[in-house]
């Protein structure tokens, strides 16, 4: 049984990053909404609890409050469960226990120099190995002015006289800055100090240990029964297939559907990898005609998603019945590459929200198909799945691949989908990706792709006027896809890509580059 740190989510955009940073220190972490009661946290048997930041003020009526019973939690040895409050987490903790939090006249945002007096390092394990004068990242409006009884300041900045505190009677700490972001120089050290030195975690949780444990868990659960998996060629389903084959061998049956909306070369690449490299039972079917006939004339993105999703389910069920006929019985389990962010989206603290777009994952099959689910990665982040893929010898062109939406190129063609427009987009996209790889930029961005727009523009090729399609290029940097910034690719590089596409893809005469961040935009255009 591994040690565990629980992260309570108060609505911060960095909550997932906190959990990931803790895991990087070899300690397993889980996210729970801040509204969960202390008894439910206690049932998880945590070695420590981290309170995330958040957008609210402790004075907001709708602002989340801290359950005071958190300070009564004990570990099996009878010692208190340590707490670390980050930004709003610090303010909520201090406010709950009698401290004073003041509204700031203006927001403090950006880098600051952390001043840790020598006695602060001596008094607190939190700053062991953290030099005074190191850079930290501030992002807050309210600030702590009077400490709760028994608390003392252990660090400050020029603009924040209370940058970090501790309880002199218990293992309770708070910082006004964000140790989880890369802009905080020694942020990982601070989180490692909390997890290891303060919480006493051993740091034995690793992707390699996960593979061994999951392999045994899957074998024990499945026994001599059979599993099917919808293979898309993306990272999650591909690594899931490799793990399940390691555990089950020929009890795994993969289904790969060509919906006519794949990237250039993807249909052959996936078959070569999983039939050739892994020697899996891979059932393939080319349903291009069926998908494109149903998408004919459709322009609404939500309708596209619905058609692609429903048609996929139909084809998937046909292939499942064929597998059942070969086996003489229906497979018991359906495996999916669900990731931890997919789950914590439904449990994190949120205010009022609206559906922006239906989730890209079309692998969510209806209950009437009557499978038991196996989701081996439901507790992992994308970067952890990539690392596991490398441990399982999944080829790098697949394990390092950028995210690709379930509806495929259907939502990267704005407007009507035709075979001709799909061919244009595939070629433009392939050139963009090829050049990113050739210039060692592919791994520097979270996601990159081309989008075919529903407009045409005037151009000149030689001495002739052209009136052809406009193609947009999109590249973003991100940690988890929840927020993203447009990638600041070199202008010379973009110019070269533009020239190649316009000269090598007849039918496109103009290239534009998307410089929108998420939010307010989304990563995909539809």
Swiss-Prot record:
ATP binds at residues 232-238. Transmembrane segments: none annotated. One of its GO terms (cellular component) is cytosol. This is GMP synthase [glutamine-hydrolyzing]. Residues 205-401 form the GMPS ATP-PPase domain. Gene3D superfamilies: 3.30.300.10, 3.40.50.880, HUPs. The gene is guaA. The lineage of its organism: Bacteria, Pseudomonadati, Rhodothermota, Rhodothermia, Rhodothermales. Its EC number is 6.3.5.2. It comes from the Bacteria. Homodimer. It is an enzyme of class 6 (ligase). Catalyzes the synthesis of GMP from XMP. The active site is at 87 (nucleophile), 178, 180. Keywords: ATP-binding, Glutamine amidotransferase, GMP biosynthesis, Ligase, Nucleotide-binding, Purine biosynthesis. Pathway: Purine metabolism; GMP biosynthesis; GMP from XMP (L-Gln route): step 1/1. SUPFAM superfamilies: Adenine nucleotide alpha hydrolases-like (SSF52402), Class I glutamine amidotransferase-like (SSF52317), GMP synthetase C-terminal dimerisation domain (SSF54810). Residues 4-204 form the Glutamine amidotransferase type-1 domain. GO terms for molecular function: ATP binding; GMP synthase activity.
